[in-house]
């Protein structure tokens, strides 16, 4: 007897943003390239920046976007809690505004969560950061089976019955949300989840992570091509390798001067 087709869940993608205009078009491309059915996705973007991206959202033509503009900046913990209150999906997937997400970001996370009924949250404790100025890739982790950073999170909405972020959290908000890393968890394949780029607009200078020896940090033989593999992502790759945002940074600096 043939198996019944699996009914895919409706997914809420959540993106907090603050003054990251130069990354937004590339963020849109990462979303457009997702291979999960678009009619089963809503994309919640919460913008508390002073340089609102409403105009870019309008030009994008991405009908899945639900854009919310806040009058003042709030801590990342409160912002993530607010996004959760808006989510309609049974699964919530994070996509931050300045990282690269592969086309299978959503589909891979959904598959892992659905195939592991006991797990409430998914993420990747092993993560890679590419340092443009050094031309080097670094591997971070894995740190533990129930550990991941927020940019890799995907979770069942029922998790929100048991936990929430500290509203006052400004960074490293994951520990409290994962209840000291005790939430039932399933690990994701880092190559199908995220590639972080160290750039001048990072909230925290990521060079501090590699300045001192650390058992959980090592230079990797992986390359950007290990992550950005599709022939349709040439423009995205060029942007992240510096051809996109470095000229824009210079333009911003010249405007200020």
Question: Which ranges hold each PLM region?
Answer:
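Conserved donor NDP-sugar-binding/catalytic core segment of glycosyltransferases
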Residues: 104-137
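Glycine-rich, basic loop-to-helix element that forms the pyrophosphate-binding segment
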Residues: 70-87
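Active-site beta-to-alpha loop of glycosyltransferases that engages the nucleotide-sugar donor
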Residues: 15-26, 36, 49
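A conserved acidic beta->alpha catalytic loop
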Residues: 44-56
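Short aromatic/hydrophobic "clamp" motif used to bind/position activated sugar donors
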Residues: 92
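Short, acidic, metal-binding catalytic loop of nucleotide-sugar glycosyltransferases
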Residues: 29-40
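Cell-envelope/extracellular polymer assembly enzymes that use nucleotide-activated donors
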Residues: 9-12, 42, 176
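Conserved nucleotide-sugar donor-binding catalytic segment
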Residues: 143-231, 239
């Amino acid at each position: 007897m043939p198996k019944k087709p699996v009914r895919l869940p409706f997914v809420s993608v959540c993106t907090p943003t603050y003054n990251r205009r130069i990354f937004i078009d590339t963020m849109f491309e990462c979303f457009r390239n997702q291979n999960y059915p678009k009619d089963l996705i809503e994309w919640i973007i919460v913008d508390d920046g002073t340089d609102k991206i409403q105009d870019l959202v309008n030009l994008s033509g991405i009908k899945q976007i639900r854009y919310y503009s806040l009058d003042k900046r709030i801590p990342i913990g409160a912002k993530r809690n607010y996004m959760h209150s808006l989510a309609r999906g049974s699964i919530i997937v994070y996509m931050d505004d300045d990282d690269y997400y592969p086309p299978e970001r959503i589909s891979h996370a959904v598959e892992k969560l659905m195939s592991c009924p006991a797990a409430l949250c998914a993420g990747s404790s092993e993560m890679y950061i590419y340092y443009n100025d050094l031309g080097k890739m670094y591997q971070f982790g894995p740190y533990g089976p129930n550990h991941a950073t927020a940019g890799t999170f995907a979770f069942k909405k029922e998790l929100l019955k048991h936990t929430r972020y500290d509203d006052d959290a400004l960074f490293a908000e994951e520990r409290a949300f994962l209840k000291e890393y005790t939430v039932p968890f399933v690990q994701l394949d880092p190559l199908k989840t995220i590639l972080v780029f160290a750039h001048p607009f990072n909230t925290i200078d990521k060079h501090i992570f590699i300045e001192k020896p650390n058992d959980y940090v090592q230079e990797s033989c992986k390359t950007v091509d290990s992550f950005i593999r599709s022939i349709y992502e040439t423009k995205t790759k060029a942007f992240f390798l510096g051809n996109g945002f470095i000229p824009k940074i210079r333009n911003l600096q010249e405007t200020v001067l």
